[in-house]
Amino acid sequence: MSFPVSPEGLNKEWLNKILDESGSLSDGEKVTNFSFENISEGVGLLGIVVRIRLTYNKPASGPASLVVKFATDEPENRELANTMNLYEREVIFFNEIAKGLDIPIPKCYFAAMDFDSGSDVIVLEDLFEYSLGDQIGGITARQAFMVVDVVAPLHAKYWGKGEETFPDMQRIDSDDFIERSVNS
């Protein structure tokens, strides 16, 4: 399925398609309008993140808002992200890995990547009621412990099994990855 590569490329038809295919719309329910705001301004180097607010044709069973992540439009940053397979890894995580995890993860409505252009899009549940850690100031010890409590089971489940479980996921210590990183 084709997908928008920037917030300006979003449209009602595409949003209706992904929400319908994810089982998020009731019979006859359609997105009739939407607006978006950039929520990555000043914090995102490798991506553009927007919050979409949705309007429906009737009382909605679908989400009131979504978070949509796009590859950055800065050529140098996009090259770095693609060299490190960051977009690919995130798409693989949401399409393949997340489904088998027993940890809290935002619902993913759609995730795809175009390898030719290096573009990607990931549409996620909007966790607006939560707050982000401060990238400059850091987080509290309590917040750090909460992260470890959630991430530890993920690491335990796949420790030493990554290559056999996800053969298409390139490791950052692989010869190919190191060679591409040095030569880019």
Positions of the model-derived regions?
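Regulatory N- and C-terminal appendages and interdomain linkers associated
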Residues: 1-45, 55-63, 162
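Conserved ATP-binding subdomain of kinase catalytic cores across diverse folds
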Residues: 36-183
